[in-house]
Amino acid sequence: MSETEYDVIVAGYGPVGETCANLLGYYGIKALILDKEKNTYPLPRAITWDAECQRAMSHCEFLSEVKTRKIRGVDNKDANKKSIMKITMEGFDTYNYQHRILFIHQPQFDEAHRENAKKYPTNTIKTGSELLAVNEVNGIINCTYKNVDTDEKFTVKSKYLLACDGANSTVRKLNGIKLNSLDADESWMVVDGYTKSSFECFAEIDAIQYCNPARPTTIIQGVENCFRFEIAYMPGDTIEEIQKEKVFRKYIDEWIGDNEVEFSRTAVYSFHAAAAEKWSIGNIFLLGDAAHQMPPFMGQGMNSGCRDAENLLWKINGVLKGLYPPKILASYESERKPHVARITRAAIKMGSVINAKNKFKALIRNTALRIQGYIKGNENIFPILNGNRLGNGIHKCLK
């Protein structure tokens, strides 16, 4: 095999591409990883890492390098800051791993993944490389990319292409795969920062859903005293105005108290729910945000992409080594798509619960959650977190 031929090309080197790079290296598969950006994104985005994804990466033996914080629980509070329902992580299935959900600081998370991926001799990692063209002929994929500094172009070949290039996926667009909106768009103001000491409101838990219909807000204590506020963008707001510190501090000072804080980012984001019409075409596969997008209310966007990688790569490894027939790869979409759809629906539903802006609906919500918490306690309030079935799998594909 020449230097321009690979078993797998990975387009995109965010968390999903990083997961692919580590798994490909672990399996000893010759891989090329491309990303337009030279470095990791310096600001936090994803903040949760669940047990399934921790377990999937455990054989790569670098998890201790990822800085994490155990999540003790979430408190849902009404407009008067009285607890509606408190959820602790006790009782939730950990899938035979140490913790059900951990907080992460994504820039450090990315760096740990990338540093480990470098150790595999079968990985060729080219950041600062922009994918320009893709086509597949007789099962061989041809990719053209350029160096973003010199504009020098290169053509490479592979047996498989994994599109981990995000919501605006170049690979998806080049292959004409339609992205269907699920009509769940919402705008939220995100404020990230650091504090020298923990906020008083986090004495027993690590996240608060402030279900105030006047301005729903999520407050999170992350890794090493990082914090995040997600503040609902309301009618009458303007992006320019709400990002001013004197404005957004009106909504968060009551939680910060006397703590000294430093803000690292303020931005208004539109949260989307969408799904690609199909997740593969020939030997080209879409993973992560390239295939599906969901609101962040369950912290499952990045985790769903990492599950995609784990599901697909052991099958590709088996096909390349002659252990399984190629048709096993059809089970990637048939297994993952229904699973992601269910989690997306749950995230949309949870968002609608948190984001009730009508006072009457908020009152009904508060009453229902209090009753549910009283009857069920902490167990299975959100059954989506306690095990999820895949769609039709290998037995269907191998018939």
Which residues make up each language-model segment?
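Helical substrate-recognition/capping region of FAD-dependent monooxygenase/halogenase enzymes
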Residues: 2-11, 26-27, 36, 80-81, ...
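Core beta-strand elements of the Rossmann-like FAD/NAD(P) dinucleotide-binding domain
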Residues: 4-6, 150-160
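Conserved hydrophobic helix-helix packing surfaces used for dimerization/oligomerization
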Residues: 8-10, 31, 284
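Conserved mid-domain beta->alpha element of the FAD-binding
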Residues: 12-22, 163, 263-350, 354
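Glycine-rich FAD pyrophosphate-binding loop
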Residues: 25-45
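Active-site-adjacent segment of FAD-dependent monooxygenases/related oxidoreductases
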Residues: 43-116
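A conserved short coil-to-beta-strand element within the FAD-binding core of flavoproteins
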Residues: 127-141
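Conserved FAD-binding catalytic core of PHBH/FMO-like flavoproteins
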Residues: 140, 160-271
